[in-house]
């Protein structure tokens, strides 16, 4: 009996691969950067040991949706030319005794806007055609520029894979499968790993020489003029009380408002479909009632009855629009909301401090 396959639980990325992805994404910014990642699967942990970028080619004509925005760089991972290029690169890596197992691809993002049709189609292609145990690494260039590396690993859930393969995103099908926008991606924890040689080299690096001990200042004036105090983060600094909004937070709010507006547009389109469907069904009901009354009269006169299913030829019900775009937009709204929640704490604290000083009676309520 074959052993049960261990599900993927984590992703371990070499530091060199992270630096390659950061360099490629920064050089291509604001254009989307994509590339392939190779490594091995060790007991449910996907170890990524190497990467290489994709050349930009034209978007394939067989896109899942005709209204998808053409983006050659974002569509590069599933292009036929790049599939052959990737196979040739992996063959060359295997010849020099490097881990040459395809474990997924990477892409760059700006302000967390990676929930789009290109990412879905690319990851669907990898999990369906290349290797089911693959991941998509998403590097957010703008978030990383704030001083914190943003590198996340995603897979498409099995429930979403089934729905996307059959292209069943109507309201009825979504209710049957209980598919929600939270079920699109499965996020895996990412761990950055260094080899033992690199770790040993880092420990052997010389630490900066300690500065000479400073004498205690004789007075408060001398303390305020001391260069050590001016350079210290603990020194009194009124700039920390500035209420200026972080540009990253401001841009995220703008993108969130745009996504909410898109959500309202999709909702209005679906409501228009429901109104059109109700009108056509009312016409069909009226026609069927009229035909039944006419057949009753003909039956009384012993005349041949008229067919009652002729309405299928006379009336055409409107086709329900796909709910996939709405699901993706909802998932993107959730992504923007999480980013705003993580960045808003510092500004919110300052605003409450100002309110407490200006309106001391309000804080007690």
UniProtKB/Swiss-Prot annotation:
Stretches of the chain forming a coiled coil according to its record: none
InterPro entries (alphabetical): eIF3h, eIF3h_C, JAMM/MPN+_dom, JAMM_MPN+_peptidase_M67A, MPN
Subcellular location: Cytoplasm
One cellular component term from this protein's GO annotations in UniProt: eukaryotic 43S preinitiation complex
PROSITE patterns found in the cross-reference section: MPN (PS50249)
Biological process according to GO: formation of cytoplasmic translation initiation complex
GO molecular function: metallopeptidase activity; translation initiation factor activity
Described function: Component of the eukaryotic translation initiation factor 3 (eIF-3) complex, which is involved in protein synthesis of a specialized repertoire of mRNAs and, together with other initiation factors, stimulates binding of mRNA and methionyl-tRNAi to the 40S ribosome. The eIF-3 complex specifically targets and initiates translation of a subset of mRNAs involved in cell proliferation.
Summary of subunit composition and partner proteins: Component of the eukaryotic translation initiation factor 3 (eIF-3) complex.
Family assignment from sequence similarity: Belongs to the eIF-3 subunit H family.
Entries under HAMAP family matching the protein: eIF3h
Protein name: Eukaryotic translation initiation factor 3 subunit H
Species for this entry: Aspergillus oryzae (strain ATCC 42149 / RIB 40) (Yellow koji mold)
């Amino acid at each position: 009996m074959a052993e049960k396959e261990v599900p993927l639980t984590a992703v371990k990325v070499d530091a060199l691969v992270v630096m390659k992805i950061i360099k490629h994404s920064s050089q291509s910014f604001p254009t989307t950067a994509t590339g392939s990642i190779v490594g091995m699967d060790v007991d449910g942990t996907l170890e990524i040991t190497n990467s290489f970028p994709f050349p930009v080619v034209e978007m394939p004509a067989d896109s899942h949706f005709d209204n998808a925005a053409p983006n050659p760089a974002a569509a590069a991972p599933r292009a036929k030319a790049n599939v052959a290029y990737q196979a040739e690169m992996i063959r060359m890596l295997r010849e020099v005794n490097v881990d040459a197992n395809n474990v997924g691809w990477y892409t760059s993002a700006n302000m967390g806007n990676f929930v789009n049709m290109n990412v879905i189609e690319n990851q669907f292609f990898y999990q369906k055609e290349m290797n089911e145990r693959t991941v998509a690494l998403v590097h957010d260039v703008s978030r990383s520029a704030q001083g914190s590396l943003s590198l996340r690993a995603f897979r498409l859930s099995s429930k979403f894979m089934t729905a996307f393969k059959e292209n069943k995103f109507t309201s009825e099908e979504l209710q049957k499968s209980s598919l929600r926008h939270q079920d699109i991606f499965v996020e895996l924890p990412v761990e950055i790993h260094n080899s033992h040689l690199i770790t040993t080299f880092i420990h052997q690096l010389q630490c900066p020489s300690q500065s000479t001990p400073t004498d205690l200042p004789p007075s408060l004036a001398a303390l305020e003029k001391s260069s050590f105090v001016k350079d210290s983060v603990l020194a009194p600094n009124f700039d920390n009380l500035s209420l200026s909004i972080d540009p990253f937070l401001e841009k995220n709010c703008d993108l969130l408002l745009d996504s909410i507006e898109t959500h309202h547009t999709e909702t209005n389109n679906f409501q228009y479909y429901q109104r059109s469907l109700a009108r056509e069904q009312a016409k069909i009901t009226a026609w069927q009632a009229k035909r039944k009354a006419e057949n009753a009269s003909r039956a009384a006169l012993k005349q041949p009855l008229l067919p009652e299913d002729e309405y299928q030829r006379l009336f055409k019900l409107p086709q329900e629009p796909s709910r996939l775009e709405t699901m993706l937009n909802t998932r993107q709204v959730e992504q923007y909301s999480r980013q705003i929640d993580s960045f808003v704490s510092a500004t919110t604290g300052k605003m409450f401090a100002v309110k407490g000083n200006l309106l001391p009676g309000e804080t007690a309520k």
